[in-house]
A protein has these predicted regions:
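Class I (Rossmann-like) S-adenosyl-L-methionine-dependent methyltransferase catalytic domain
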Residues: 270-275, 287, 316-317, 321, ...
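Low-acidity, Ser/Thr- and Arg-rich intrinsically disordered low-complexity segments
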Residues: 1-15, 19-31, 36-37
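Class I SAM-dependent methyltransferase Rossmann-like catalytic core
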Residues: 95-169
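Short, Lys/Arg-enriched N-terminal segments with co-localized hydrophobic residues
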Residues: 44-58
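Class I S-adenosyl-L-methionine-dependent methyltransferase module
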Residues: 100, 120, 149, 168-279, ...
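A short SAM/SAH-binding and catalytic strip from SAM-dependent methyltransferases
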Residues: 299-312
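Conserved SAM/SAH-binding loop
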Residues: 280-284
Length: 379
């Protein structure tokens, strides 16, 4: 296996090294699910059932990590909730997992490796049994990979943010950190159905059709004009590579076939003209990449769930580089990640709040679903 395959990127972000995994374990909401999720309406476990984070800044135990994952996964996958709870209660399996490097013990990574290696559609007990029996195959793959989910639906809030900061027809240079395979670097190549209180707004003509529910304001009315695009990732994936596409599919929940269909459609759209993705570290490579933007374009740097996984110093370096180059910045990150965005929000609220905040140039715009399926404007 080539060296490019040996350096995978961070959980669900597709980029960077994790120095502190605590941000991954957000405080769960009281209830989770959006109605479109198979797990809609699943309630948060009673108080006391979710173990507290270590107060000394240390790493949570593997058992605690999987129990917390079960709470978060209730938003997206009932099957993976079963898997997480079963692993959390299996001392033999936890002991095996603890032999992996710390940054490779994340539930999302291990579930994805299992999917890549052909785990059947089984309940929690069946998954734990399969995992133990196949550990000799699982361990080396888990030790060399890190998840880099690439969800094209995140283009829906991206389109909304770009409309707020660009003029109609203004050409944009789009630069994404943690780009994975680059599915979010081509928002104008897809089509959209934004559903708001005043009806449905359709934009674009490409595939897949990305559906987003909008509340608290109007739906976007135009797509961006992307004249130049580049991505940054420690280990870029290629939509033309069957191996890379198989990994992208393995990163998705087994009980969300619509996400797999959407991924395949986006891959098909991009495979004849894939975005260019530069291999490298965001803090180190972003300055040169921004310097390469052709003149006359509005430069927009995008982070769709990536900054949370960068070490603090690297995150600050990225923000400083964007400011120094006079570029715009669109972020879809956990709400408390960027203090200046939180401060700018003040007392503004969204009709349908989520743990994720869409912001542009430091101005908070809306709450949004982690994978882009809802957008709730702040007011």
């Amino acid at each position: 296996m080539s060296s490019r395959r040996r350096s995978r990127t961070c959980p669900d972000a597709g980029f960077g090294a994790v120095s502190d995994m605590r941000p991954f374990y957000r405080r769960p909401p009281t209830s989770v699910g959006t109605g479109s999720s198979p797990a809609a309406g699943i309630l948060r476990p009673p108080a006391g059932t979710v173990p507290p984070l270590p107060q000394d800044g240390g790493m949570p135990s593997s058992a605690d990590r999987f129990r917390r994952a079960a709470v978060e996964l209730a938003q997206t996958s009932e099957r993976q909730v079963e898997w997480a709870l079963a692993v959390a209660d299996d001392a033999r399996l936890l002991a095996l997992i603890d032999e992996l490097p710390a940054q490779h013990r994340q539930p999302s990574l291990l579930f994805s490796v299992a999917r890549l290696l052909g785990v059947p559609d089984v309940d929690g007990a069946g998954f734990a049994a399969w995992f133990r029996s196949e550990w000799a195959r699982v361990a080396p793959v888990a030790a060399e990979r890190r998840t880099q989910t690439n969800e094209a639906l995140r283009c829906a809030p991206l389109v909304a943010a770009l409309e707020r900061i660009t003029e109609p027809g203004e050409p944009v240079a789009l630069v994404e950190i943690g780009a994975s395979a680059g599915l979010c670097l081509a928002p104008e190549r897809y089509s959209y159905a934004f559903t708001a209180s005043d009806g449905e707004t359709r934009l674009g003509s490409g595939a897949p059709l990305l559906r987003c529910a909008v509340s608290g304001g109007a739906a976007p009315a135009r797509l961006p004009v992307v004249a130049w695009r580049r991505g940054l990732d420690l280990a870029p994936l290629d939509v033309r590579s069957p191996e890379d596409v198989a990994w992208l599919e393995a990163l998705l929940p087994p009980d969300r076939p619509e996400r797999t269909a959407r991924l395949r459609s986006a891959v098909e759209t991009l495979e004849d003209d894939p975005p260019t993705i530069v291999a490298g570290d965001a803090a180190a490579e972003l300055p040169a990449l921004l310097d390469a933007v052709p003149p006359g374009l509005r430069t927009v740097v995008v982070s769709l769930g990536t900054l949370v996984y960068l070490p603090w110093a690297a995150r600050e370096s990225v923000l400083a580089t964007v400011a120094d180059r006079g570029a715009s910045l669109v972020t879809l990150e956990t709400e408390a990640l960027l203090p200046h965005v939180v401060a700018a929000r003040g007392e503004r609220t969204a009709p349908e709040p989520t743990p994720f905040l869409l912001a542009a140039d430091g101005v908070p715009l809306a709450s949004a679903a982690a994978h882009g399926g809802t957008l709730s404007w702040l007011a």
